[in-house]
């Protein structure tokens, strides 16, 4: 994949009873760093590994009553590699051009708050690098 494309996955979202587009995500296993977990989840969900992973920041959902953090990373220099995952069905990988992010953020089937926030942050981070 190229630096102008983000890989999305389409999966069934039981909470809203429909298929949703979103970013690759998953939990950090014991002993893993955020970078290692991101690389593993990318292999499981999208069929790619990353030679380079940049950690941008941690996000919290409701810091006044939850301690959960999500780590926002940008994976680059991808290569094909698949690991078996724990999803009940195979996920569809949907490449999306970064120049079309505004259109993506308005789609009804792209509604997960973490993914929306992550794209805003990543877009600004990428702008600063160019």
Feature locations, PLM:
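Short loop segments at secondary-structure junctions
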Residues: 1-3, 12, 76-80, 98-99, ...
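N-terminal strand-loop-strand
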Residues: 1-23
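Short secondary-structure boundary/hinge segments and terminal tails
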Residues: 17, 61, 122-123
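Unchanged
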Residues: 26-117
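Charged phosphate-binding loop/patch that engages nucleotide di/tri-phosphates or the phosphate backbone
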Residues: 118-130
């Amino acid at each position: 994949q190229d630096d102008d494309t983000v890989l999305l996955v389409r999966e069934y979202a039981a909470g809203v009873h429909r298929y949703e587009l979103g970013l690759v995500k998953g939990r950090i296993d014991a002993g893993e760093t955020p970078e290692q977990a991101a690389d593993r989840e990318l292999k499981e969900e999208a069929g790619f590994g990353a030679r380079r992973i940049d950690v941008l920041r941690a996000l919290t959902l409701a810091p006044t009553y939850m301690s959960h953090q999500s780590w926002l990373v940008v994976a680059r220099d991808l290569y094909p590699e698949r690991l078996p995952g724990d999803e009940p069905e195979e996920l569809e990988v949907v490449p999306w051009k970064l120049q079309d992010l505004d259109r993506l953020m308005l789609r009804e089937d792209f509604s997960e708050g973490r993914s929306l926030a992550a794209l805003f942050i990543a877009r600004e981070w990428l702008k600063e690098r160019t």
